[in-house]
From Swiss-Prot:
The keyword Glycosyltransferase applies. PANTHER family: CELL CYCLE PROTEIN (PTHR30474), PEPTIDOGLYCAN GLYCOSYLTRANSFERASE FTSW-RELATED (PTHR30474:SF2). This is Probable peptidoglycan glycosyltransferase FtsW. The chain crosses the membrane at residues 11-31, 48-68, 77-97, 134-151, 154-174, 177-197, 265-285, 306-326. Peptidoglycan polymerase that is essential for cell division. GO terms for biological process: cell wall organization; FtsZ-dependent cytokinesis; peptidoglycan biosynthetic process; regulation of cell shape. Pathway: Cell wall biogenesis; peptidoglycan biosynthesis.
């Protein structure tokens, strides 16, 4: 029997289209940065092309990995993530005051990206188990350890993404109100404490509320991001015609690439990106629902968790760029420049494709019996 009709072609097609779009937009947005930092205005385009090819090859490999192996190796994955986070204190590369990358000569690794997958696997395994008395303590311990290590970098953005996905997961599976309220209270307390004890986070919050009050200081990024959107209007200025990317807007090819998309392709271009990302999200949630209907609890919860991670990160990135959320320094999934982020996001989508494939195969086998 041919299995080609079991592949989720729409999800795969949207992912490939976004990867191609990423190559174009990173190439356009990074011209000035590449010329200034590396004296080669195409340097980021070339590296992003390589990242995209590697990501596609990894997707093919991951798609052929049975889902049960992710559950089987969840402890190894989370342990590996914790070890990599620990090594950042000794071998991490500092950038803008944060140690988030490890230089392995041939590439830079961002351990916090691996945490997103390993934590999803661990959480999904926990939720799919019937006896949770001992595993609850282990889960809480891992959450606290990972939180401490992420804050030591500091990487507040990844922590917000993980906690947000955790709370939404608990809500989706119908956890009791008391447990959900307690988790929300703990998360809120941590966030407020971090803002209070870290002056630069408080300044970011103030600048987010009124960026024009200090447009040459903490509000600089947001002001120039807004100017990009204002200049783009409905249809944009055309690819390559952004002004803000020319040494005005910091990180135009990473954290603020949506601003350059808005300036060059307008609100229409932004709408297409938002629709594509939400398409991936709803596809993932539908895949998870079908897996749960087939009593594949780990697969279903994993699909939910992955989908939430992708859309929450997307909302935070776009929201901070348009001024409705504080700036967190997160990339736009698939689109932004960044090898680790692109690779891990593509691996997540490959896992979704595999879950969908296995669910369809199970239905066919059950029908034959």
């Amino acid at each position: 029997m041919k299995k080609s009709h079991l592949y989720n072609r729409s999800l795969l097609s949207v992912t490939i289209i976004l990867l191609i779009f990423s190559i174009i937009m990173v190439g356009s947005s990074s011209v000035s940065v590449g010329n200034r930092i590396r004296t080669d205005y195409l340097s980021f385009l070339k590296k992003n092309f390589i990242h995209s090819i590697i990501s596609i090859l990894c997707m093919i490999f991951v798609f052929n990995v049975p889902i049960y192996k992710w559950k089987k190796n969840k402890n190894k994955l989370i342990l590996c993530s914790i070890i990599l986070l620990l090594t950042l204190n000794y071998f991490g590369i500092s950038n803008h005051g944060a140690k988030r990358w490890i230089n392995i000569k041939i590439a830079f690794i961002q351990p916090s990206e691996l945490v997103k997958i390993s934590f999803s696997c661990y959480l999904s395994s926990y939720l799919s188990e019937k006896n949770k008395k001992t595993s609850t303590i282990q889960l809480i311990s891992i959450i606290l350890i990972v939180s401490k290590l992420l804050l030591s970098q500091p990487d507040f953005g990844t922590l917000v993404i993980l906690y947000s996905s955790l709370l939404f997961m608990l809500f989706l599976i119908g956890k009791n109100f008391l447990f959900l309220s307690a988790s929300s209270a703990i998360f809120t307390t941590i966030v407020l404490s971090l803002i209070y004890f870290r002056s630069y986070r408080a300044k970011r919050l103030i600048s987010f509320l009124n960026p024009w009050s200090n447009y040459l200081g903490d509000g600089y990024q947001l002001v120039h991001s807004m100017l990009s959107f204002g200049r783009g209007k409905m249809f944009g200025q055309g690819i390559g015609n952004s002004i803000q990317k020319i040494n005005f807007l910091p990180e135009p090819h990473t954290d603020f690439i949506i601003s350059i998309i808005g300036e060059e392709l307008g609100y229409l271009g932004i709408a297409m990106i938002v629709i594509s990302l939400f398409f991936i999200f709803f596809q993932g949630m539908n895949i998870g629902r079908n897996a749960l209907k087939d009593f594949q609890y780990f697969s279903g919860f994993l699909a939910y968790s992955i989908s939430l991670l992708i859309i929450i990160q997307s909302i935070i990135n776009i929201g901070s760029s348009i001024g409705i959320l504080p700036i967190k320094g997160t990339t736009l999934p698939i689109i932004s420049y960044g090898g680790s982020s692109k690779l891990i996001t593509c691996i997540k989508i490959a896992i979704l494709l595999r879950i969908d494939f296995e669910t369809k195969m199970n239905k066919i086998q059950a029908f034959r019996r």
